[in-house]
Amino acid sequence: MKAKKVVLIGWDAADWKVIDQLIEQGHMPMLAEMVKKGVRGNLSTLEPVLSPMLWTSIATGKYADKHGIHGFTEPDYEAGIVRPISSTSRKSRAFWNILTNQGKKVNVFSWWPSNPAEPIDGIMVSNLYQRASKPGAKNWGMNPGTVYPQELSELFKSIRIHPEELTEEHLLPFLNNAHKIESKEDKKLQALSKILADAATVHSASTWALENSDWDLTAIYHDAIDHACHAFMKLRAPKLPGVPDDLFEIYSDTVDGMYRFHDMMLERTLKMVGPDTNVILISDHGFQSDHMRPLSLPKEPAGPAAEHRKHGIICCYGPDFNEGQTIYGSSILDITPPLLTLFGLPIGEDMDGTPLIQAFRETPTVKTISSW
C-alpha cells in the first residue's frame, strides 16, 4: 500500500441517529457523499465516558491504565491541589509521536488533552487555543505552550474568532424566532456564540495549515457538537414534557444547525485535501436525542455524561477504503492501528485496538512491533 495523505477528524458526541435524519433531509450533503462512497459504522465507547480519557485512547490505541489519562483533572501532590489534565501526564506515545519518529509530518489541532503542545515534526495547536479567556477580542491573550512551533504563535493568535465578533448573520442559522430573544445577555445565546466561535477558530487554524504547510497526516478535533448537545438537546424536537415553550420556539433547531455547520466545515476540508487523501471521521460517543433524553442530571462533576450514548460514529472515505460498506464491532481503540497501517507502519503489540481490516479496499499487510 502506497502511503497517501490522511486526515483524521473528530466530532465529539456525533451520533448517527441525528446524522441519518439530517442526511435524509438533505442537510448534510458532504457526509452523505462520504457514507455513499466510503465505509460507515458504530464505534463503541469506553467507560467512564469522559472525553479526555476517550480521545487519548483514540490517539494511543490503549486503555487508560496504559496511557495514564483518566478524566478531566488530576492531583498535583506537590502543590496539594487538583489541576486540569494535561498532555504531560500521558504515559504512552500518541500517533503524532509515532509518525514524527518515523519521519512523517503531522499537524494536530485541538486534540483533547494536548496542552502544552508537544514538539512534533509539524504543527500542534492545543485544546486551549480556541478558548476565549476574557471579554473582548482585543484583550484576548494566548498562554505559552498553546502552539508548537512557538514562532507560529502570533500567526495563529491572529486568526482566532472571539464570540463577541459574531454577528446576527452568523447566529441566525442556528435560531428560530430570534426576534423573541430579549437581550444580547441571554445566557443561551452567549453559550451558542462561544460554541460557534470555538469551532470556527479550530477550523480557521486547521485550514490555514492544510493550505500553508507540508503534512502527511492532519488531525482535527471539534467539541462543538458535544457542547451544543449538552446546552440545547433538551430543546430539540420532539418537545419534551416540561420544556418551556419560549425556549423551544427559539432553540429547537440549534443542535441540527451545529451539525449542518460541521458538514460545511467538512466540505471545505475535503475540497482542500483532494480526492487522493484518506479521510477518517469519528466520534468518541453518541448523545441521547429522542425520548431517552434525561431532563435532569446527577449532581456531580461528571453528571452530564448521563446524556451520552454508548456508540459513536466512524466513516472512512478515500482511495484505500471500501465503498458503500458498513463495518461492525469496532471501538474507539481501533483508530490508531489503522492510521499506522495506512502508512505501512507496524502496530504495537501492547495496543488494545485492531487495524480495522474490514474497512480497507484491499487487505493490507499488518506488521507488529512489541511497543512504540
Each predicted region: which residue ranges?
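Histidine-centered active-site microenvironments of extracellular/periplasmic hydrolases
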Residues: N278-G318
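Beta-strand elements within well-structured catalytic alpha/beta cores of enzymes
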Residues: A3-D20, M34, I58, L99, ...
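Non-catalytic, well-ordered alpha-helical segments in soluble enzyme domains
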Residues: A32-E33, F95-Q102, E267, P275, ...
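Active-site rim elements
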Residues: I81-S86, S193, S252-D256, D320-G329
